[in-house]
Amino acid sequence: AWAKHFNLIKYFNKDLDISEFKPLKQNNGTSFKYNFDKFENTNNTIEVFGWACFDNINAKDSKIEILLINENEPLKAIKFLTQKVNRPDVTIGNKSNVDLSNSGFSSTYNKEKLPKGNYKIAVFVENKINNKKGLILTDKLIKIE
């Protein structure tokens, strides 16, 4: 099982073209809700745990990505390694009539090889079945010196 895990990481595409959202604003595309339950920026690692979902759309088919956006290259985003987390509390907390339990995520990023610069943390959610896509720039800023 471990070998499979490492193969997935080996072929992980770290960049995401977000030029469709230019000019980049705080809220881009379809609006959605999100929350960071945990955000830690340590010496080498950024960890983010939380949830994100579109209103009134089952989260089962939504893909969630946590991104780093360099202020000098705002149309190219660096993806975190993001895994889905089951969060039945999100459906209850939002008093939703649709299942939002697949809206949870856990993300980590090793920032040792990041070029110097200022990076904003962004949340990207896409649901191809419902043709919805959105990107939100958060208030989280990472400075690499």
Locate predicted features.
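Basic, ligand-binding patches in group-transfer machinery
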Residues: 2-145
